[in-house]
Regions:
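Repeated scaffold domains used in trafficking and secretory/extracellular systems
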Residues: 1-18, 46-60, 86-99, 125-142
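Sequence/structural signature of beta-propeller modules
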Residues: 1-47, 150-154
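Short beta-strand elements that form the blades of beta-propeller/WD-repeat-like
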Residues: 11-27, 56-67, 72, 98-106, ...
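Aromatic (tryptophan-biased) beta-strands that constitute blades/sheets of beta-rich domains
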Residues: 29, 35-48, 81-86, 91, ...
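Generic "edge-of-domain/loop-turn" microfeature
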Residues: 35, 78, 90-92, 102, ...
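A glycine-rich, hydrophobic loop/mini-helix early in the fold
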Residues: 37-83
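Short loop/turn segments that connect beta-strands within beta-propeller blades
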Residues: 76-78, 114-118
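Short acidic/polar capping segments at secondary-structure boundaries
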Residues: 108-110, 117, 126-129, 145
Length: 154
């Protein structure tokens, strides 16, 4: 497990680690005063995507994590699983807060979830939502809506 993401919610430190030996799987470690107090392993379905800063979202006492093709919502500091929802056929790259809900950017789908993990709407394109050019974001929320770029720039 070499890829880690750290988040901070006073008085806790949260480490999310990719388990490269068993993808898509992440371990969540909760620390207080640099001592581990709890941990949990989350196992998603679908394909693997690397852990990065937008793979997790702190929302009050909730931690949302994109793992494989699912989003998991766990309660802090108990690490109790509140819900998990499949948001893409393949993999979920990121989750962002939007109004009182969440928007996920998957390889094949964009999904809006409510706070209970229920899908409010979803959108699929003709191709995968990734940009072949690094400088061009494939997914961007604007005041007018969501800008998307697929692999064919459509």
């Amino acid at each position: 497990m070499k890829n880690s993401l750290w988040l901070y919610k006073n008085p806790y430190q949260i480490e999310i680690r990719e388990n490269e030996a068993h993808p898509p799987q992440v371990a969540v470690y909760l620390y207080q005063a640099e001592e581990e107090i709890k941990n949990v392993v989350l196992i998603g379905g679908g394909s693997v995507s690397s852990l990065w800063e937008k793979s997790a979202l702190l929302d009050g006492d909730r931690l949302l994590i994109a793992c494989g093709n699912e989003v998991f919502c766990i309660l802090l500091p108990t690490l109790e699983l509140l819900w998990h929802t499949q948001v893409d056929m393949a993999t979920c790259f990121q989750i962002v807060a939007y109004q009182d809900d969440y928007i996920t950017h998957g390889e094949l789908e964009i999904v809006r979830l409510n706070k209970q993990g229920e899908i409010l709407w979803q959108f699929s394109g003709k191709d995968i939502f990734v940009s072949p050019i690094e400088r061009t974001p494939a997914f961007k929320i604007t005041p007018q809506g969501i800008d998307l770029v697929d692999f064919n720039y459509e």
